[in-house]
Amino acid sequence: MSLLSIRDLDIALPEGADRAYAAKDISFDLAAGEILCIVGESGSGKSMSANAVMGLLPQEVKPVRGAITFDGQNILALSEAQMLELRGRRISMIFQEPLSALNPLMRVGAQIAEVFEAHGQLRPQQRHSRALTLLEEVGIPDPESAIRAYPFQLSGGQRQRVMIAMALALEPDILIADEPTTALDVTTQAQILDLIEDLRRSRGMAVIFITHDFGVVADIADRVIVMQTGEIVETGAADEVLLRPRHPYTRALIAAIPRLTLQADAPAGDRVPVLSVEGLNKTFVTGGGGLFGKPRVVRAVRDVSFDLHAGETIGIVGESGSGKSTVGRCLTRLIDPDGGRVMIGGADIALMSGAELRDKRRQLQMIFQDPFSSLNPRARVSRILTEGLIAYGTGRAQAMERARELLGLVGLDPSAMHRFPHEFSGGQRQRIGIARALALEPSIIIADEAVSALDVSIQAQVLDLLAELKARLNLSMLFITHDLRVAARICDRIIVMQKGAIVEVGPTGKVLHDPDTAYTRSLLDAIPGQEYERALAAGGDF
């Protein structure tokens, strides 16, 4: 007997949307203890279908037909009070963007404790103890410090782990995981996948796992659903769908998966450094709240040095909290380093101010990790893409034309110009962020997890686009990523960071296939779907 049954579900979009339905004719069952993966491009209806199960659809989006049956009840017919009782306790969800889902004004421990309080479970001291245990289970380093921290004080991967801890707090019957490992490094991702597998086995918990990572699908899925523009186009056992796909769309998605065996070409042209980093250091002081709080010193970046050459792409990889993103922010002067030099064109940007720094920032643009927090929620896409151009002297009409061109380059329709960031899926918002970074035609791009929120087909398009721009404009890129397959596809060299320091650097093929350090080997061993990749290459089973 099915634990959850969805039949003939139609979810209507508001008038004026690019299509009539977010999801159309959706039908599937979920059994106790089963892991069902839903894959598809951004905007395919994956998240909308999951939100309908939770009763969390946007106000303007309505289920207009069908039924969602759980424990003998049609969820679509329940009152809000009944849904509040159901959410968290029986069905729980891990959201895609933790920074927007977590309360920025509450400490992590209070947010986890709030889950128990809302359902009348545990005494206050027990809630604190259970919160610590949950943070340990999801791999948060130093849970005692993390429980007192605010979300902004944690890395992107650590914030996602907090969200997972909250979702698992009440040990639900069904866990809906919407891209839960997108922001996680490979070792933490492996820990979370193992944790979800353990809970499935020990408690019979069922999981709906929404992802664009086919390696993850191969490692955990019992069954797979493939969605395209709101409809299910293929469903079946994981090995059947992944190795013997029937639908052309599924075959196209699988063909776009980056492989460790696909290496970037060696950079051509001169070897002139366009960016030189020498002895970069950055320390943060966290904690110390209240009269007796003890501050904690974190050396986020320790003596980092490297050169980035014209036309070269360097990948920076490592676990969450290794200092990857902090390096990127120091280079752009979004935060100031404590020591070291950052040389662009022979000039140290640490000594620049005013017009000189402004001019250098035009040459060096950043693509951020979390598009929801880096895009102005009150600005239409047209303003987001044109304000930088206009600030540097481009006429409004020319800037608007450039914005339309940029949207096409990143795979979005020009009609997106008139919409706000909240009207897009997570992957679509990331594409807008990439378009904004490309607007001023910089010579250096710092991409902080720039494709982590994208499905494989759009990811492949964006990587191809960046490679094309690199060749055409002699563009140099610093590519911060936790996805070693993406690094294999686009990077000429790889820097491996651990606890703020560089532990290995070398050509991509050397680092990925003959690493010098045990730490790099541990990252490689944790990559999901390696057996699947070998099976694809050999044409066999996994």
Residue ranges and their predicted role:
Residues 63-74, 340-348, 402:
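Conserved ABC transporter NBD signature motif
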Residues 169-173, 439-443, 459:
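A short, proline-enriched helix->beta-strand linker immediately N-terminal to the Walker B motif
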Residues 73, 126-145, 348, 397-415, ...:
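Conserved ABC ATPase "signature" region
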Residues 232-236, 244, 505-506:
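ABC ATPase "signature
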Residues 62, 75-92, 110, 118, ...:
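ABC ATPase NBD coupling module
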